[in-house]
Curated annotation (Swiss-Prot):
Pfam (any one): tRNA_Me_trans_M
Reactions the enzyme catalyzes: S-sulfanyl-L-cysteinyl-[protein] + uridine(34) in tRNA + AH2 + ATP = 2-thiouridine(34) in tRNA + L-cysteinyl-[protein] + A + AMP + diphosphate + H(+)
Disulfide bridge map: 101-198
Major location (coarse): cytoplasm
Region (Interaction with tRNA): 148-150
Active site: 101 (nucleophile), 198 (cysteine persulfide intermediate)
Protein name: tRNA-specific 2-thiouridylase MnmA
CDD domains documented for this protein: MnmA_TRMU-like (cd01998)
Entry superkingdom: Bacteria
Assigned keywords, A-Z: ATP-binding, Cytoplasm, Disulfide bond, Nucleotide-binding, RNA-binding, Transferase, tRNA processing, tRNA-binding
Gene for this chain: mnmA
Record: residues binding ATP: 7-14, 33, 125
Amino acid sequence: MAKIMVAMSGGVDSSLTAVLLKEQGHDVTGVTMHLWEGDDNGIMESQCCSVEMTAGARRVCAQYDIPYYVFNYQKDFRKHVIDYFLREYSSGATPNPCLACNRDLKFRVLLERAELLGFDGLATGHFVQITGGGEQPYDLRRGIDINKDQSYVLYMLSQRELGRLHFPLGGFTKPQVRQMARERGLVTADKPESMDICFIPDNNYRRFLNEERPEIMQPGPIVNRHGTVLGQHKGLPQYTIGQRKGLGIAAGSPLFVIEIDTVRNLLIVGDADELERRDFVIDDVRSVYGQIEAGIYAVQIRAHGEAVPATITPREDGTLHIRYDQPQRSVTPGQAAVLYRDDRVFGGGRISTERYS
């Protein structure tokens, strides 16, 4: 049996992960990453870093005689997640902080610490599956619960990392997970889901940006493709590609955000057809198998979106050109584009602010 560190948020998924591994005979230790202290707005009870949620993890570990520790990673979180979040908004992109946290903290910093402490591997409660191994490469696959599948936010995992990771919940649905937790009497069995932006407790990221980077929240013109001024925006980070509501302009037909120009501080709007794109570029490319070959893949550009066929062409600078068979709406710079074949993840990258032509 293996010695496994389990990253525990205090929710039902990571709690059951620890218990299942313990029941399988593994030597399990629970660990919570203390990432964010919060501010005057406090921490919501459903947040993964809240006192209440951490207490849940501690109680589950006590119930099953699992050693439990809290590691302080606030400085790393500031560097790798908060600063990234602010940097992306400053460049006109829409960040995904969960991706940054997985890439730079959970599956790099924490995994490295687990190895230094003598653990054989790290486990989390993500709904994904790992197959293969031995003489075959490891495969990262979607979880069987399509509504909870989290492979989109784990596309950056390498062969080395997959060989040290455990995802016991990938073969279960969320209702099954909750039921198994209830059967075991876990106090976290009916805990609500944690919020996406864990470091913004009131979910008001505009307030957060105003406090952290007021200089990027300057108002400016809203224009169409022809440069006609239609109104004034309240700061570019308050908008995202495809947004329709909250623009504060009147027009004869619906208008959507189609481009964010940080150089000229312009919010560019247009009709629905102008949202469609067939071609775009992804940078910071990661591959499960070492490199991504040219070819046809199903490409997913939103966490719970559909993976749609596209042709992938590697470029000399290490980026990938993606060309969809059919135009897609709201291709959003800063978000991830993840490449699949069937349920298998091949890799992905960040949708670039570069306009491909």
